[in-house]
Amino acid sequence: MTWFTPDVIDAIIAVVKAIVVLLAVVVCGALLSFVERRLLGWWQDRYGPNRVGPFGMFQIAADMLKMFFKEDWTPPFADKVIFTLAPVVAMSALLIAFAVIPITPTWGVADLNIGLLFFFAMAGLSVYAVLFAGWSSNNKFALLGSLRASAQTVSYEVFMGLALMGIVVQVGSFNMRDIVEYQAQNLWFIIPQFFGFCTFFIAGVAVTHRHPFDQPEAEQELADGYHIEYAGMKWGMFFVGEYIGIILISALLVTLFFGGWHGPFDILPSLAFFWFALKTAFFIMLFILLRASIPRPRYDQVMDFSWKFCLPLTLINLLVTAAIVLLNTPAGSVQ
């Protein structure tokens, strides 16, 4: 009797896929810190990292050495258990969310029928990590930063979910692969769901706390916000987690609005991973370009923009989409 039954083999393959995907995401997140500094230097007419290795290519190695060997100090006035748990929860929630992203027709960690709901569950979990970090630090700037972050995240996640309901109404499924295949047979959702794309992208920038929505970390006001007391690997987990969030939102934009692994007009379908990676890289560069070109607004302007502009626009988009779907549905087929 062998242990390698078909079920065991399937489980081993699933574990290997999960490890490969998660390691690739972590490595890409670490590399993005170097890529961002080089691109910002290029766009701002300066050099950027150029001291460690040829063209500064080994800067990431220097950053990692510093992160690994810097003292992992915990303030004596902090709640040590929650203080340590916060960065672990933050990074774990982002990594687990990648489980529902279909990279190619055959590569993906999990094919869940509730893929979109699973993503929002993990996105909501990351809010607790930020609150844990701010409260457990026992620092007024950290607490204010965490309160800003949680309020901003909750505000933008409201219409972030509604922005995708138009897609769900058209496809009739929360499954990511079903959404990709629907786009392969019809138009990419960037065309019929353009306003949903705009609001989801704005919400994605806000949820990842990226410029211009980096209010929770505003250096001029909050001295780096909720991770002011963190150092060493704990700070590194927050730092790399921010770039992992960028990759996650970019991959979701590609999957939900730009046909996933399909190329334009289904050109070269055998290059599924290439198309997915190329489109994801484009949105990652767009995240970085926003940081280089747009000033940071006031916090009240950020919140007003969410509730007074984005939410009504998302509701209108959902109502119009639902009306069109109902009008195009044959009589008697609506259940």
From Swiss-Prot:
In terms of InterPro entries, this protein maps to:
NADH_UbQ_OxRdtase_su1/FPO (IPR001694), NADH_UbQ_OxRdtase_su1_CS (IPR018086)
User: Which GO terms of type biological process are on file?
Assistant: aerobic respiration
Cellular-component GO terms for this entry: plasma membrane
| Keyword terms, alphabetized | Cell inner membrane, Cell membrane, Membrane, NAD, Quinone, Translocase, Transmembrane, Transmembrane helix, Ubiquinone
Membrane-protein topology:
Multi-pass membrane protein
Q: Which reaction does it catalyse?
A: a quinone + NADH + 5 H(+)(in) = a quinol + NAD(+) + 4 H(+)(out)
Its annotated compartments are:
Cell inner membrane
Entry GO MF terms: NADH dehydrogenase activity; oxidoreductase activity, acting on NAD(P)H, quinone or similar compound as acceptor; quinone binding
- Which residue spans traverse the membrane? 12-32, 81-101, 114-134, 154-174, 187-207, 238-258, 270-290, 307-327
Give the chief site where it resides.
membrane
Does this entry carry the keyword Translocase? yes
Which Pfam families is this protein grouped with? NADHdh
- Where, if anywhere, are coiled coils annotated? none
EC number assigned by the record: 7.1.1.-
What's its job? NDH-1 shuttles electrons from NADH, via FMN and iron-sulfur (Fe-S) centers, to quinones in the respiratory chain. The immediate electron acceptor for the enzyme in this species is believed to be ubiquinone. Couples the redox reaction to proton translocation (for every two electrons transferred, four hydrogen ions are translocated across the cytoplasmic membrane), and thus conserves the redox energy in a proton gradient. This subunit may bind ubiquinone.
> How would you summarize the oligomeric state and partners of this protein?
NDH-1 is composed of 13 different subunits. Subunits NuoA, H, J, K, L, M, N constitute the membrane sector of the complex.
Protein name from the UniProt record = NADH-quinone oxidoreductase subunit H
